[in-house]
Amino acid sequence: MFMQLLSEARSYLEYGSGGSTIVATRMGVPTLTVESDRFFARAVTKQIAPGSPHTMLVADIGMTREWGVPVFKTPTPSRLKRWRTYVDLPFDTMKNDGIFPDLVLVDGRFRRACALESARQAQVRGVSTTIFVDDYQGRSYDPIEEYLGKPEMAGVAAIFRIGPHTTTVPVSAVDAAIHDYG
């Protein structure tokens, strides 16, 4: 299902880089990636052909271990600010482009917050998008469903179709999801 959605995408945002990044750029889909591990981001970027329509954004969320997971998870004001940067970075980057991704892959850190903020940003801009949350099954994602409704499932992934019918996501819900990450 993901490959079908990606092949239909005109613009693609992903939280977390890896194989999907390489596939998207090889398909020629304009891709914006947010990564929390600068070393992994560098390794992925080396595998992307020069001139590919790709932008890699590395968010400084503090010290990380494997998979870009924060070493320290107790929410403090400074950590919450850094973690919020990861969630907001792609939208801060694209706000003047007039482009909004029609496909968002949430496969990195702060998944609840990233899904909710992606939906919120689409609502603010009055556009539709599809949010694909990988590894959804077996995890606690009730805050996402509270605002976005029950997802369509594709294996262990969840697909949320965001449009005019979607309940408006308040900033406070995104903030709570970031705070509850730890």
In which residue ranges do the predicted regions lie?
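Glycine-centered flexibility motif
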Residues: G18, E66-K73, G108, G149
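Short amphipathic alpha-helical segments and helix-helix/interface helices
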Residues: F2-M3, T21-T25, A41, T45, ...
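Short, flexible loop segments at the rims of nucleotide/cofactor-binding pockets, characterized by
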Residues: E8-Y12, S78-R84, V104-R109
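C-terminal substrate-binding/active-site "lid" region of AdoMet-derived donor-dependent transferases
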Residues: T93-G182
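SAM cofactor-binding core of SAM-dependent methyltransferases
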Residues: M1-W67
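Short, charged, surface-exposed secondary-structure boundary motifs
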Residues: F40-A49, R65-V69, R139-E146, F160-H165
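S-adenosyl-L-methionine
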Residues: T45-G98
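N-terminal donor/sugar-recognition subdomains of glycan-related enzymes
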Residues: M1, S7, K73-K81, T166-G182
